[in-house]
Regions:
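Conserved active-site carboxylates
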Residues: 100
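N-terminal lobe of the biotin/lipoate ligase/transferase fold
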Residues: 1-87, 91, 109, 116, ...
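Long, positively charged amphipathic alpha-helical accessory segments at protein N-termini or as interdomain linkers
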Residues: 66-68, 75-93, 103-240
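A generic fold-level signal
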Residues: 26-27, 53, 96, 121, ...
Length: 240
């Protein structure tokens, strides 16, 4: 499996590296993993805190030709990570729609999917995964220390990043390539793990509050405002 993983000591961004790599041809899927990112990217153009040696920073490159529902890519990747945290780290996690994995005291993982178009057609998905492995909450920048956590903080244990990385990639392969689950099973599993269902949530793009009631068959967040129901497929959603 190691020939399907590129390990880097340092890179500007695994996503930028993967972007160039996927356009150059070669067998997929493949993962780009770095020990340190100088320009790690998060959602909405924000930087992603990725200090040297403390986390898993990777981009998994997927050919989308056999992916039926593109909107489920991030959802499926979140399930892959959550299962490994449960099986390898003995941690029960929840999923904060659309792209965060939460533990009891905060966010431990963020997932960012970017679709790459070639000659007018969506050809690749770059699935960025960042996991806070070692360190304590006080080690984070002031603006995120109250909402972030690490595997070490939660368990008091040190985890082998290489083993953890390879287990996650193996599970991504099982879900995306070997079709470990049907799309319906993926959605049902994520519903069970959802941190948002049956709660009031604030949708920033709408600038208003809704009540989260379900996850749609294509991974959208189903919300209710009075008697009106709608499905949100992108944007930022926070707990009210």
């Amino acid at each position: 499996m190691n020939d399907k993983i590129i390990y880097l000591d340092e890179v500007d961004s695994t996503n930028l590296y993967a972007d160039k790599l996927c356009r150059s041809g070669g067998e997929l899927p493949i993962a780009v993993v770095a020990d340190f990112q100088t320009k790690g990217s998060g959602r909405m153009g924000r930087s992603f805190h990725s200090p040297k040696g403390t986390g898993i920073y990777m981009t998994y490159i997927l050919d989308t030709q056999n992916i039926e529902t593109l909107n489920l890519i991030t959802t499926s990747a979140g399930l892959a990570v959550a299962e490994v945290l449960e099986e390898y780290c003995s941690l029960i996690s929840s999923v904060k729609w659309p792209n965060d994995i939460l533990l009891s005291s905060g966010k431990v993982c963020g997932i960012l999917t970017r679709l790459i178009t070639v000659e007018g057609k969506i050809k690749f998905a770059l699935i960025g995964i960042g996991i806070n492995v070692s360190g304590k909450k006080q080690d984070f920048p002031e603006e995120i220390k109250d909402i972030a956590t690490t595997l070490e903080e939660e368990t008091g244990k040190a985890f082998n990043k290489k083993i953890l990385t390879e287990k996650i990639i193996e599970n991504l392969n099982e879900i995306f390539i070997n079709k470990k689950y049907t799309e319906k099973q993926i959605v049902e599993d994520v519903k069970k793990r959802s941190a948002m269902l049956n709660k009031n949530v604030f949708v920033k793009g709408e600038n208003r509050e809704f009540f989260a009631v379900d996850i749609s068959s294509d991974g959208g967040l189903v919300v209710r405002d009075g008697g009106e129901m709608k499905v949100i497929h992108s944007g930022e959603v926070e707990f009210s």
